[in-house]
Regions:
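A short acidic, Gly/Pro-enriched loop at the edge of an enzyme's catalytic core
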Residues: 259-271
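Conserved class I S-adenosyl-L-methionine
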Residues: 201-211
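Class I SAM-dependent methyltransferase SAM/SAH-binding core
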Residues: 206, 214-260
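N-terminal accessory segments
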Residues: 2-142
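C-terminal alpha-helical "lid/dimerization" subdomain adjacent to the S-adenosyl-L-methionine
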Residues: 286, 303-347, 351-355
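Conserved alpha-helix/loop element of class I SAM-dependent methyltransferases that forms part
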Residues: 167, 178-201
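A short glycine-rich, Lys/Arg-flanked "PGG" loop and its adjoining helix->strand segment in the class I
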Residues: 286-298
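Core SAM-dependent methyltransferase catalytic element
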Residues: 347-377
């Protein structure tokens, strides 16, 4: 209950005008430098890519293209601002405390920035040559499913190396212009609905595809004593997550596949998955979704955070076309056309709502409660 008490105290403090002003100043002081840092990386990355293309004497491939509308930079920045206003509104409403992004020390930021820029030439080379199978080798073959052994995002090492895990969060924040953590936090109000008034120590949550543990870090800031299980197929990413989350207790991690999750039926009060489902082949994606339904308790909640899909935001349609062309995302197109409401119905889950969050969205599903289940709604 400690996390809930802390959040309630924070909410009461928001009724004080001075506290509200202080909160807004603190929020801006933490988020604006992050955005500037990662937008700066994004602009530098684009300039370096253009320089590399001119140096190479033109394109070695057909460049990304779309006939669908693409938002201009002014629109993108306006929608980024809307996401941050929503993030701040959630803080002021007491849905979660003023967040700490835990990006690390200045030395750590510079180290990860160096790793990011050092990998750009190799990423450019792979993108121009459409090379994405360097991860597949005699050493890795058979250790992971074939669909997993690729250079996703054209990054070195795919998901299979410690350097990849160290670079990953910088790459994602650059791609999202510093909004990735704010996007992840939009899942927290959906969990608060089902956790409110309950002893967090007696609940269970599984984060599917936990990666480097950034969402679990944000989750623990609200429910520090909530027992959580992080599952990922990458041992290096799990190792990174353990280091990043060493400040928290009540945590376990396992290496495993989303399509064969080693947990009992009806064992989890909530399941979360952040930016995973667009990385899965259609068949695996549907099996993974059914697995989530299997081990959710009656009355439990599934919260997915992932990319927008076709039809969600008409003037963003072009971005959905360009993304898999610029970044190696072989299963993204099928994801953008996946009917998750139909999947939910087939698995016995009830669709609750979708909340848009800049270029992403939060999808919420519940497993109907039995007569003895927890009536959280």
């Amino acid at each position: 209950m400690a996390g809930a008490i802390k959040t309630d105290r924070w909410k009461r403090g928001m009724s004080n005008p001075l506290s509200r002003i202080a909160t807004r100043v603190a929020y801006g002081a933490s988020q604006l430098p992050r955005v500037a840092w990662y937008v700066g990386h994004s602009l530098a990355m684009r300039r370096l890519a253009e320089t590399a293309r001119r140096r190479d004497g033109g394109a070695a491939r057909q460049h990304a293209h779309t006939k669908a509308p693409v938002p201009d930079r002014r629109r993108l920045y306006a929608d980024m601002a809307m996401l941050f206003w929503q993030d701040l509104a959630n803080v002021e409403a007491g849905l979660y405390p003023l967040p700490a992004d835990h990006d690390g020390s200045l030395f750590t930021l510079i180290h990860r920035s160096r790793l990011f820029f050092e990998d750009l030439p190799a990423i450019h080379r792979r993108r121009e040559r459409r090379a994405h199978n360097e991860v597949l080798s005699e050493e890795t073959r058979g250790k992971r499913p074939r669909y997993y052994l690729q250079n996703f995002h054209f990054q070195s090492g795919g998901w299979m190396t410690d350097d990849s895990a160290e670079r990953y969060d910088t790459q994602v924040e650059v791609l999202f212009n510093g909004t990735a953590n704010a996007t992840r936090r939009q899942a927290l109000p959906q969990l608060r609905e089902v956790f409110a008034g309950r002893d967090q120590r007696k609940l269970r949550l599984l984060d599917l595809g936990c990666g480097t543990g950034r969402f679990l870090d944000l989750l623990k800031q609200v429910w520090p004593r909530l027992p959580t299980l992080g599952l990922d197929m990458s041992e290096p990413y799990i190792r990174h997550a353990k280091r990043h989350l060493k400040r928290w207790s009540w945590m376990r991690f396992i290496v495993g596949k989303a399509e064969a999750i080693p947990v009992p039926d009806n064992s989890q009060d909530a399941v979360t998955s952040i930016f995973l489902f667009h990385e899965l082949p259609p068949k695996v994606r549907r099996i993974a979704f059914s697995e989530c339904a299997r081990f959710l308790k009656p009355g439990g909640r599934l919260v997915l955070v992932d990319s927008l899909q076709h039809g969600d935001q008409p003037d963003y349609e072009g971005l959905l076309d360009l993304f898999p062309q610029n970044y190696h995302e072989p299963y993204y197109l099928s994801y953008t056309n996946e009917d998750f409401c139909a999947l939910a119905a087939d698995c016995g889950l009830t669709y609750i709502r979708t909340v848009k969050a800049f270029v992403s969205k939060v999808m919420v599903f519940d497993k109907p409660a039995t007569k003895t289940g927890h009536p959280h709604l």
